[in-house]
Amino acid sequence: MKSLPFPSPSRDLAGDSAQSLLLAARLHAPGSYLGIHSVPGGELVRVFQPYMSRVWLQTSSGFQVMECTHDAGIFEWKGEAVTRPYLLRLEHAETGVIEERYDPYAFPVQISGHDLYLFNEGRLLQAYHMLGTHQVKNQGVTGTRFAVWAPNAERVSVVGDFNHWDGRVCPMMARDHSGVWELFIPDLPGGTLYKYEIRNHSTGEILLKTDPYATRYELRPNNAALTPVESRYEWQDNDWMVQRAGWDWLHAPVNIYELHVGSWKRHPDGSFYSYQELADHLIPYLQEMGYSHVELLPISEHPLDESWGYQVTGYFAATSRYGNPEAFMYFVDKCHQAGIGVILDWVPAHFPQDSFSLARFDGTALYEHEDPRLGYHQDWGTYIFNYGRSEVKSFLLSSAHYWLSVFHIDGLRVDAVASMLYLDYSRKEGEWLPNRFGGRENLDAIDFLRELNTMVHGEFSGALTFAEESTSWPAVSRPTYLGGLGFSMKWNMGWMNDTLNYMQLDPIHRHYHHNELTFNQLYAYTENFILPLSHDEVVHGKKSLLDKMSGDVWQMFANLRLLFTYQMTCPGKKINFMGNEFAQGREWRVNHELDWYLLERDPHRGIQMLLRNLNHLYLDTPALHELDFFTEGFSWIDCHDSEQSVISYQRRARDGSFMLVILNFTPVPRTGYRVGVPESRTYQEVFNSDSTYYGGSNIGNPGDIVPTGQQWSGQVDSIIITLPPLAGIILI
């Protein structure tokens, strides 16, 4: 941003009151006392340097000694007009070392009134350019501009090693009535640790806070922010970004590998892979396995590993656990060059109570609601954002914008949307407050989500948004101009719950629960659904996918193969959590890598091979993905064979090509099974989950399958096939 015109020298307010407030670290307007001031006969320069024994001021006549007017470290000089900005020569009291530096109070503020206005209105979508820290030039001098929002503060200071963490030394300038504080500190190198010391105006409480807009933090358990280093990363993903802008994602295959960076793989000593190492190892694996995207569990900075990243303290920073921001850029860039999209799990629903971060940031409920019935999440022990506060809206929208813009992220998965939409979410009667109409809908959250999706789709062509929404809220993935929330897709939690419940049943009981396989088609096209088998289903005693399956060991693996066949052929885009693809035996453990040694065993290698083949079949076959969101892409052949627990359906592409899917959910091989077909021609089996390659019994249908000439199940013809046990087959 361009500097504002330098203000005229202020009237000297060097009374006892201002001096006392400075020394007590309570001075609200440091520019009224420090810096240059007009006095009779010229100008006065006043600095506060409590750790210096002597101070000189550079004038047109050279360096002049400044008079120490208070033994706490106040130095003054009076004379004719001083050239701005002016340089100070400082002698350290402890060491005698002499250094030269510019006075922060010799520089004008830089943030424009227009940006402050937009921020206060909730319409500043790139607030990260204004707030936080930035390496800038001010009056030709390079330095760091600090800016933070703390409207209920009496005083805000930048503190760090460079000023002995002394809140008296670098108090910030209050920017009118915006609640924003700003200070330019010259010659501060990138990578310098800092925090904000905030004194509440009403209570006098002093808080030490990290920067909400910082782009980098020190490694946990420490939590100071770091001043930025100029990024020199040169992106090489232009082809991907151009292609994405014209991407017809509604009709394209979307097959997502959900991954936690810290527990996918680790070094033998248990240390994390860096972002660069992850790129080098993960990308070839994703390509081999046939995934179109990788979705990262939250990599925004967070203090607690066991939160999986869902208790965020740094909404603009890639966690330093795995490297610096440029290293994460490298990861995204390499994914794009390999044709892999990158989706981030993003958490605008709540934030942790950690005292160093957003919670009661300036001594008041700033980012959260004051009333715990609105502002406290009982299940997670976290605070809920106040979406009705304009500056909070600017903060969250800017966070989303930052990841999509600066890091070229291809999509955001918004966590816990249901908890945002309902004021009574997980609350008993009397524990929540209704909206202004007396209802339980969070109107502010609804507006925020619509603005979020409007921004993403309007400014980042081809970028996607995913809602993890577990209720029947209507039109989650419908455009905002039609009254929807505007998400690209919604997680189909109903399909996931029904399917996993069904797969855990003993096959002898499954025919009583046949509707759990068929009910999904009654609502499958009310939203743009994605079918998840996610991290939430393999933790907290829920068991791994393999352990959920019923039967003996052979049947458990057969059931898992059948589950993946059903998922990959059912309408909807796909997402699978890491480890699912090779039948991880244990629940996911965040502090350990996956059990890769299982791939030494044939059944696990078989699952991996099956899912690899299914993934590539899905990517390469228009009938399995082009019409995922449209009724024309799916039709039942027979959904009524509950007695034998068999379902059959066809998937179609826009050009009319189709595939037939027949699934047998019992361990009984069925010979002579008649299936209706839409065309009187020969068919071939192109996939069989019971293949010996996958660990099955190799029962199937080799060669041509000839129609019988008999109509069946409302189809023009039929075929006679053999159905393998606990398996699915695909015919073309």
Curated annotation (Swiss-Prot):
This entry's Gene Ontology molecular function terms read:
1,4-alpha-glucan branching enzyme activity; cation binding; hydrolase activity, hydrolyzing O-glycosyl compounds
Q: Which Gene3D superfamilies match?
A: Glycosidases, Golgi alpha-mannosidase II, Immunoglobulins
Q: Which UniProt keywords apply?
A: Carbohydrate metabolism, Glycogen biosynthesis, Glycogen metabolism, Glycosyltransferase, Transferase
Instruction: Report which superkingdom the organism of origin falls in.
Output: Bacteria
Q: Where is the active site?
A: D415 (nucleophile), E468 (proton donor)
Which GO cellular component terms are attached? cytosol
The record's catalysed reaction(s) read:
Transfers a segment of a (1->4)-alpha-D-glucan chain to a primary hydroxy group in a similar glucan chain
GO BP term, pick one: glycogen biosynthetic process
- Which Enzyme Commission number(s) are listed? 2.4.1.18
Q: What class of enzyme is it?
A: transferase
| Pathway membership | Glycan biosynthesis; glycogen biosynthesis
Function per UniProt: Catalyzes the formation of the alpha-1,6-glucosidic linkages in glycogen by scission of a 1,4-alpha-linked oligosaccharide from growing alpha-1,4-glucan chains and the subsequent attachment of the oligosaccharide to the alpha-1,6 position.
- Which family does the record assign? Belongs to the glycosyl hydrolase 13 family. GlgB subfamily.
**Assembly with partners or alone:** Monomer.
* Protein name, as recorded: 1,4-alpha-glucan branching enzyme GlgB
**Organism listed in the record:** Nitrosomonas eutropha (strain DSM 101675 / C91 / Nm57)
Task: Report which gene this protein is encoded by.
Answer: glgB
